[in-house]
Structures are given as structure tokens and as C-alpha cells.
């Protein structure tokens, strides 16, 4: 990053007015595709790596793309000729792919620099651990046990294209960049009307930026109203949110919207309120009455409909009572469970028993959805009965075994925080038997004959790292008992959702 520091450090006026000329600088393309820079950056979300585009990158293509942008008429492409008229051996869509990647990099440069100045001087002890998905569950266990209602909101997307352009106008004062941005968006809408694969049009990084800028706009308004509604500020957990670099814009948006909300929304006053956003959704946890939760619900509906011009239905906002309903959160089903706790106390010579009720957050595995995901990938049928993986029979035995072991260990690693391991053991059983059936099918044998020939040592490969560690830490009697059945482990190295969570 220091290599490009001289190019990226602008003063206030230049940073606001000279973004468009960066499209014609070759070093920006190097910044977008350089692997070394991506590895040096600690925040992987700022500069995403894309192997597909690295294969196509070359300085010759960059120069041709720059010349093409100089000739503005060459960028105006009839929709019927998207895949025709190749320019120097490449289709017209390919150059829009390059531009989309470049635009995402250019607009992220001010954000990345602003993020560094935002956290400058602030000390975060082991903040890299807070990037783990599992790091948020201990926080929820500590906080949600004192709450009774959770508002589950599905953030609407997509929105009108002009709204996206208006959002960027708050911090980008370069009219040329905005016009160029609007031109690319509307060209993309024209492509959607034709038979073109989505993944070959624009880079996902481009849409990730659009989505986060849109969500940041919504959250800036929400946080502003939240601070205005109560004098007590809740603890900040910004580092737990996805794409934290966009939270540097919050203070900027507060100045913009301060004149639009002169009155304090007293109806929404609640000092005990926690907000978490994840995977296109957000939850609002509080200890309130159903009346106030319904007010928050319609607040979100009116905010999206009136300000963002999005038809947002109230059915997308669910009010869950934690003691009765299950909250689907990051692949887990969470709910509050009342555990009776009996304590025997003795005062002088008289002893008495005190019955206490302890509230505990119970996290379970959504076995039904996971079985549907396994059935979709041909590991089992919809009833959960294991079947052979026919598409893997052409691989070697070691390759097949390593694939199943890796999947089994990843699932066990992700769902190690489940309060009950029964469903996890069922998933392991499905994968083990599917592996045996796949190997037996490859060797044209039955499952019983195949196991008899190889022995039970084959299944020992599925012994997960958690089982090995726990067997060394705990005594054998404790390890074999039912107490270990309830042990919950949260790991701080899980940065991505498990593939089975994205079954929809």
C-alpha cells in the first residue's frame, strides 16, 4: 500500500473532484489486480481477490480499455450487439467487466484511507478475533438472555438505480464520475433483458459496494434516530458488522440529516436496544412490550417506503418472542430456554432449598434445512437417507475420502457451538455412510463387503479435530459421559458462512 501512497493521498478538494481521471491511469488497474497488495492488506473485504479476472489481466488489455474510454462513442453499445463486434479479440462485455472492477476500487480508496484515520489512535485488543462469525454468539448469549423480543428484518434489495446514484452524491462531488457510474448501471439493466449469464456481466465486487453503500445510508438514519431517542448510548460493536469500512460515513450522514429530524421521536425511546446486521438481514433485540415492537416494525416499513422509494411489506419484519419462537441466525436456531437451578443453602443448623430459574440462550442446528442442502448436493435424499455420490466415482480413493473428511470437519467446526450435538452426529453419519457407499460403488461392491475388506479404520479418518482435542483435555470417563454432549465451543477463526447455510 505504501507503494501507491503518493498516488492516493489527495487533499480535500482533489479527493472530491478528481476521481474520474483515475479511470485513465494504468497504476489503478495494477492496484485492482495486484495479488501482493491484497495479501498485505489485513482487511480482506477492502481489496477482494478475483482469480478469474487475474487470468485475463494484461497491460495491453488495460491500454486498449483506456483508449476505448477516450472514444466515448465506442462505449455506447447496442444491446443486440453485446456479444458481437469483438474489439481486439475481446467482446464488448469484457471491457465493461474491467470498468466495473475499476470503479469499485476507485470508490473504495477514499473509504480505506478514511477508515485508517478513523481507527488511528484507537486501541483494539485482539480485534482480529472479533472478525470471526462465532465471536458474535458469546455476545448474544450475554445480551439476549436479558431480552424477550427480537425484530427480524429482511433488508430489501434491489432498489431503484437512481437512488444508488443519489446516495453516492453525498460524498462524491465529481459530476463526471457520477454520470459514468449512472451510465454503467443503466447499461447493466439493458443487459438483464437479454439472455446473458449474470456472472459474465459485472464483477460481484461492484455490486458488493453498491449494496453496502445502500445499507450504510439506511443505517446512518437508523443510528441517528436511535441516538436522538435516548440519552443512554448502547455499547458499540461496529467491528462485528460486515464491511466495517463503511461505518466511517456515519458521522458524515449525521450532519446531513440533522435538519430533517428536528423532533425527538419519544415513542421509540428505549435505552436497552441492540442491533446486529448479517447476511442481508438485521435483528433488533430489546426488552419491551409488543406495542413498542410494532412501532419499530412500522418505522422500518415507512423508512424504506418513504425515503428509499422501496415497496417494503410488513411481512418482511418478524417479531419473535425468544421464549416461544426460534430465531434463525447465521445457520443456527436460537431461542431462550428456562433451566431450573436447584441450590441448597444452609444457615446455622437449618438447611433449605432455593429453586432458581436461569435463562439460557439455546442454539440448535436447523437439521431440516441442512438435510435439504445435502439432498440438493446428492449426498442423501430428502428424508436424510445417505446415497452414493456418483459424480465422484471417477476420482481416486484418497481424493474421495479427503473430500468427505474435509466437509465433515468443516461442518463440525462451524456447528461446534450447538447446545445439543445429536443433530450434528446425524449429519456426520450421513456423510460417513455416503462416503462408504461412494467407494463401494466405485469398486462395484456392497457396503458390507467393502467395510469387511478394509476394516473399521476407514471411518477413523472422520474423527474431527474437536474430538481429538477434547479427548486429550478431558478425562476418558468425562469424555464418554453425557456432560461432554452439552459442551459448546466457539472458534475465533471462522470468517465465512458454511456452504450449507446458503442452501436457499
UniProtKB/Swiss-Prot annotation:
Query: Keywords of this protein's UniProt record, alphabetized?
Result: Chloroplast, mRNA processing, Plastid, RNA-binding, tRNA processing
Key word Transferase present: no
Q: Name one Pfam family in it.
A: Intron_maturas2
Keyword Acetylation attached: no
Q: Where in the cell is it found?
A: Plastid, Chloroplast
A single GO CC term for this protein reads: chloroplast
Q: Which GO terms describe its biological process?
A: mRNA processing; RNA splicing; tRNA processing
Q: Name one GO molecular function term.
A: RNA binding
Q: Mostly located where?
A: plastid
Q: Which InterPro entries match?
A: Domain_X, Maturase_MatK, Maturase_MatK_N
The text of the family note is: Belongs to the intron maturase 2 family. MatK subfamily.
Q: Which HAMAP family match?
A: MatK (MF_01390)
Q: What does this protein do?
A: Usually encoded in the trnK tRNA gene intron. Probably assists in splicing its own and other chloroplast group II introns.
Protein name per the record: Maturase K
Which organism does this record belong to? Pseudoturritis turrita
Upper classification of the source organism reads: Eukaryota, Viridiplantae, Streptophyta, Embryophyta, Tracheophyta
Provide the gene name from the record.
Answer: matK
Amino acid at each position: 500500500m505504501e507503494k501507491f501512497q503518493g498516488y492516493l493521498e489527495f487533499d480535500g478538494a482533489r479527493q472530491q473532484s478528481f476521481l474520474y481521471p483515475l479511470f485513465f491511469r494504468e497504476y489503478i488497474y495494477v492496484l485492482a489486480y495486484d495479488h501482493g497488495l491484497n495479501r498485505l492488506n489485513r482487511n480482506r473485504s477492502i481489496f477482494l481477490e478475483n482469480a478469474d479476472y487475474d487470468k485475463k489481466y494484461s497491460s495491453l488489455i488495460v491500454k486498449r480499455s483506456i483508449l476505448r474510454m477516450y472514444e466515448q462513442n465506442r462505449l455506447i453499445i447496442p444491446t443486440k450487439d453485446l456479444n458481437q463486434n469483438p474489439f481486439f479479440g475481446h467482446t464488448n462485455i469484457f471491457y465493461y467487466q474491467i470498468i466495473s472492477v475499476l470503479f469499485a476500487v476507485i470508490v473504495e480508496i477514499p473509504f480505506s484511507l478514511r477508515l485508517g484515520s478513523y481507527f488511528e489512535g484507537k486501541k483494539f485488543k485482539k480485534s482480529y478475533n472479533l472478525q470471526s462469525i462465532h465471536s458474535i454468539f458469546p455476545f448474544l448469549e450475554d445480551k439476549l438472555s436479558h431480552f424477550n423480543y427480537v425484530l427480524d428484518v429482511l433488508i430489501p434489495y434491489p432498489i431503484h438505480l437512481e437512488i444508488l446514484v443519489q446516495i453516492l452524491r453525498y460524498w462524491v462531488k465529481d459530476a463526471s464520475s457520477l454520470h459514468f457510474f449512472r451510465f454503467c448501471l443503466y447499461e447493466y439493466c439493458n443487459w438483464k433483458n437479454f439472455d446473458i449469464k449474470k456472472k459474465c456481466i459485472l464483477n460481484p465486487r461492484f455490486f458488493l459496494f453498491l449494496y453496502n453503500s445502500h445499507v450504510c445510508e439506511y443505517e446512518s438514519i437508523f443510528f441517528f434516530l436511535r441516538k436522538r431517542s435516548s440519552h443512554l448510548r448502547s455499547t458499540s460493536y461496529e467491528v462485528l458488522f460486515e464491511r466495517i469500512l463503511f461505518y466511517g460515513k456515519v458521522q458524515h450522514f449525521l450532519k446531513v440529516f440533522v435538519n430533517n429530524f428536528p423532533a425527538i421521536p419519544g415513542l421509540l425511546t428505549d435505552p436497552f436496544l441492540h442491533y446486529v446486521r448479517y447476511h442481508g438481514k438485521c435483528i433488533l433485540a430489546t426488552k419491551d412490550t409488543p406495542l413498542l415492537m410494532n412501532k419499530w416494525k412500522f418505522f422500518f416499513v415507512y423508512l424504506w417506503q418513504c425515503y428509499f422509494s422501496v415497496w417494503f411489506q410488513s411481512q418482511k419484519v418478524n417479531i419473535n418472542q425468544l421464549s416461544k419462537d426460534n430465531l434463525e441466525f447465521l445457520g443456527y436456531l436460537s431461542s431462550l430456554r428456562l433451566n431450573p437451578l436447584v441450590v441448597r443453602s444452609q444457615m446455622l443448623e437449618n438447611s433449605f432449598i432455593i429453586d432458581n430459574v436461569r435463562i439460557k440462550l439455546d442454539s440448535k442446528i436447523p437439521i431440516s434445512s441442512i438435510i435439504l442442502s445435502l439432498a440438493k448436493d446428492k449426498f442423501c435424499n430428502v428424508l436424510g437417507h445417505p446415497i452414493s455420490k456418483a459424480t465422484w466415482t471417477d476420482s481416486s480413493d484418497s481424493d474421495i475420502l479427503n473430500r468427505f473428511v474435509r466437509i465433515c470437519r468443516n461442518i463440525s467446526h462451524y456447528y461446534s457451538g450447538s447446545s445439543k450435538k445429536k443433530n450434528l452426529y446425524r449429519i456426520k453419519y450421513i456423510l460417513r455412510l455416503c462416503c462408504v457407499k461412494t467407494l463401494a460403488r466405485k469398486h462395484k461392491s456392497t457396503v458390507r463387503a467393502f467395510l469387511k475388506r478394509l476394516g473399521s479404520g476407514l471411518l477413523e479418518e472422520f474423527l474431527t479435530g474437536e474430538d481429538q482435542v477434547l479427548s486429550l483435555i478431558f478425562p476418558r470417563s468425562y469424555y464418554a459421559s453425557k456432560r461432554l454432549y452439552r459442551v459448546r465451543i466457539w472458534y475465533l477463526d471462522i470468517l465465512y458462512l458454511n456452504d450449507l447455510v446458503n442452501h436457499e
